Amino acid sequence: KKRIDESYMLHGPYIKRIDDQTIEEGFFYFGLKHGRWVRLNRSDILQDKETYFMGWLNESIRFFWDPKKENLKEIIPIKYGEKNGMYYAFHLNGNLAAKGEYQFNNKIGVWIEYHSKNGKKKREIKYNKDPYNKNKTYISREWNLNGKLIYDRDLFLKKINK
C-alpha cells in the first residue's frame, strides 16, 4: 500500500465534469458517498440514481454485534431489492471476517474468509463468475492461523492426476 502525501480526503459537494458537461454529481462525507448521487450521459439523460448512507447503498442491510450499533457485524448490499455488490462481515473485535460479491441474489467470484485473531486469510471459496451458471462451488485454498497454506485445490488435483 502506497501513501500519497499530496492527496486530500473528499468532503462536501462533488461534481464530475467533462468540459462543461456534468457527468456525476453527489456529496462526500469524510471520503464516503452520502446522500443522493446521479450519473448523466453527455446528452444530460439520467443513467443512474443511487442513495448512499455513509458509503453504503441506502437499501443495504446492516447488522451489528451490539444494541448501541457501534460494532458492525455484516453489511448485505441491496440494490433494487436484490443482493448486488460487495458483502462484508466482521468479527466481534472489528477485524474483517469475510468478503465477497453478490450479483442478482447469488454469490459470485472468489469469497475470502479471515481469521479473527490476526486477520490473515483463512479460506478462499470459488463461486461461479456468472450467477446463472450452476457449477459446483468449491474451496480453492485454505490457510492455518499462522498463515501457512494447508490446502491448495490446484496442487491437490495435479498430484492425483499424475
Residue ranges and their predicted role:
Residues 1-162:
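Glycine/tyrosine- and acidic-biased, solvent-exposed loop/turn segments at the edges of beta-strands
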